[in-house]
Amino acid sequence: LEHVKHYISLFAGKLKKNGEFYEVAVELRGGQETGQDVIHSRARAILSDRLVPAPPYQFSKAMIAGAYTKNIQDVYDEILFHGFQLRGIRKIVSCSSRGMVAHISSAPGPREWISAPLRDRWIADPLVLDCAFQMAILWCFEEKETVSLPSYVSSYRQYRHQFPADGVTVVLEASEVTNHKMRGNFTFSDSNGEIVARLIGYQAILDPSLLKAFKPRYRALA
């Protein structure tokens, strides 16, 4: 990615009414200038003229029962593949078979990452969301000694216009894990414990070959 240009395209379909809301089909595609696009992801964006109140939420005390002993710098050096700008996990508060709790930094402004951004501020915070998926990778590594990549999300709902600038606490509640798949939900809250957003029905694929792709030095162990 550092030496080759990659073209990313965003597509939006026709507006459709669904009850009291409107929906738009969206796609993220990548490819070359030849027009041979690859569809990376699809979703339905639900449009509304108002925010809905955040639901009440309190995670189980069992979620914070297990300590996480690895150093964050070591985590990024030894397990995760993310570069410096995406290293947003500040502290992993706890990790157990039930899930993980972590403090996550907010992303810098769009102009720090995009040469000509469409907005001056983020709506959904890209660094926070990516770090949530990083948490899932680390949790899978603790439980199954292998890593994962996201494959599906049922829904994402945000309860305010933007994420707090001072970061959030993210709770990953794992609902299922096998040798090949994990499922769970994410809850994002501010420093006062108020819910900022929820991501429901997260699914990831586990595969030992991914660790070799993340960290080439592990290829010798194949």
What are these regions (language model features)?
Residues L1-A222:
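Acyl-thioester-processing domains in fatty-acid/polyketide/NRPS systems
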